[in-house]
Amino acid sequence: MIPGEVITPETDIELNVGRETLKVVVANLGDRPIQVGSHFHFYEANDALQFDREAVKGFRLNIAAGTAIRFEPGQSREVELVALAGKREVYGFAGRVMGRLDENVD
């Protein structure tokens, strides 16, 4: 191995295998582009984005880490979301949750 070398498998790397996903149509009703990052809690995304917010609570974009999707003004598009994992606690973002997503978890 050469220092700094990255050895990858010969097959494609699959992201979020076995995790719950859903597709949702999102429209940008604003007059400016809106960009949402890969790990942003989609429920708390910019209010100019129109979609069923309650349906996406606890989900983020199902895209590679460090990437984003840009919604142009007037644009409507379907995106795939993936359920948040781990402790399923959300803090920060727009401050709409600030705690556990699942009430029945101790």
From Swiss-Prot:
A biological process from GO: urea catabolic process
GO molecular function, a single term: urease activity
Keyword Hydrolase found: yes
InterPro entries the UniProt entry points to: Urease_beta-like (IPR002019), Urease_betasu_sf (IPR036461), Urease_subunit (IPR050069)
Pathway in which the depicted protein is active: Nitrogen metabolism; urea degradation; CO(2) and NH(3) from urea (urease route): step 1/1
Transmembrane segments: none
Domain of life according to the entry: Bacteria
Nucleus recorded as keyword: no
EC identifiers of the protein: 3.5.1.5
Reaction catalysed by this enzyme: urea + 2 H2O + H(+) = hydrogencarbonate + 2 NH4(+)
Predominant localisation class: cytoplasm
GO cellular component, one term: urease complex
Keywords: Cytoplasm, Hydrolase
Subcellular location: Cytoplasm
NCBIfam families: PRK13203.1, urease_beta
Summary of subunit composition and partner proteins: Heterotrimer of UreA (gamma), UreB (beta) and UreC (alpha) subunits. Three heterotrimers associate to form the active enzyme.
Family: Belongs to the urease beta subunit family.
Name of the protein this chain belongs to: Urease subunit beta
